[in-house]
Amino acid sequence: MGKKKQKKGQGSRLEVIFDEEKRREYLTGFHKRKMQRRKTAVEEIKRKIKEEQKKMKEERHKEYMKMLKEREEALCELEENDELEEMVTSKTESVRYDHPNHTVTVTTISDLDLSGIRVPPLGNAEQKQEEEKVEEENEKGADEEKPKTSVSLPKKSGDPFLSKKICSLTASLHARSQRKSGKRPSRTNENKKQTSSKMSGRTSKTQRRKQTGKTRRRRN
């Protein structure tokens, strides 16, 4: 009689007990976790788009202020040049004489109209005061008649704040939203086509070939 083999470790058995609720939640929660991951991804993409738009807005504002500053400087230069041109009454070009050993250039200074600078005329002090009063009154009237001129601001472009990064993020967001709302194509159309062909009595070429093959086999 052979000895019966004793099973090893009978006293040290381990039992694994699962929590039924957690087990059921894990097994049935694949779709739920997938939707949660998709939701977090969409929120992250939206956050990145907002940050990129804010960055682009700040860059556009800096460019706009730079353009405004350049325009104001250009307008100031033009006004100064216009004032100088009004004061100058005659202009002469410089003449250059070539000599074998020397080069001589002769330039003449343009005559200025000193009446624009308001030089006080020669005369009595009373006449000067009266003329100054008349000039002040004329200036006040001219200031009232002149409309208030303001520096024309550069127009802002109506284009949206878009960049390559924003375009790529919006494309991925659009793709994810389409995946979420998209449904699998149903086979109802195919079934409808089959039923309509049966009801009408028409058969396709492949169906006719199958039928002729079956009849030939039966005859053989």
Swiss-Prot record:
InterPro entries listed in its UniProt record: Nucleolar_protein_12
Major localisation: nucleus
Regions of compositional bias (Basic and acidic residues) in chain numbering: 139-148
Compartments it resides in: Nucleus, Nucleolus
Compositional bias per record (Basic residues), positions renumbered to this chain: 176-186, 205-220
Stretch forming the signal peptide: none
Pfam family, one: Nop25
Coiled coil: 31-86
GO cellular component assignments: nucleolus
GO molecular function, a single term: rRNA binding
Region entry Disordered, spans: 109-220
Keywords linked to the UniProt accession: Coiled coil, Nucleus, RNA-binding, rRNA-binding
Transmembrane segments: none
Summary of the function given for this chain in its UniProt record: May bind to rRNA.
Similarity section: Belongs to the RRP17 family.
Protein name (database record): Nucleolar protein 12
Gene name as annotated: nol12
